[in-house]
Amino acid sequence: MSLSVDTLTFDCRDPRVLADFWSAALGYELQGIDEESSWLRDPTGRGWPLLFLIVPEGKSVKNRVHLDLRPETSMADEVARVQALGATIFRRVDENESFWTVMLDPEGNEFCVLRGPEDGWVAAE
């Protein structure tokens, strides 16, 4: 017997703000919204649904889990695009011939933008 991921859930203060940000960042569609939550789905059916659930407390420590996002073009282009949507750069990492940018969404949740094909990244076959 095994488990499969059904939904990726974000605790947040404002579900609509995060749903709007992640919808624009990932190209996901808004599936629903109510007073306590918003949810998105990947129109291609490949990605997990995202649920944004209101909680009373704010974020106070580093995420224990985060998203690593691979751009279709370059890391620099994607970092600039998500910055325009409301993300901020937390730090840039260059370790052992790997590099990525750690970013924060509008509520401070960490995510990483990795190298893309224009940066020399090649998918493993």
Task: Label each region the model flagged.
Residues 10-14, 70-73:
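Short, surface-exposed ligand-recognition loops at beta-strand->loop->(often short) alpha-helix junctions
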Residues 3, 13-17:
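N-terminal amphipathic/basic helix or basic patch
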Residues 23-24, 79-85:
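Short amphipathic alpha-helices in soluble, non-transmembrane regions
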Residues 16-19, 74-79:
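Short, conserved charged micro-motifs
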Residues 16-35:
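N-terminal first-folded block
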Residues 3-7, 31-32, 38-41, 46-53, ...:
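Vicinal oxygen chelate
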Residues 67:
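Phosphate-centric recognition/catalysis
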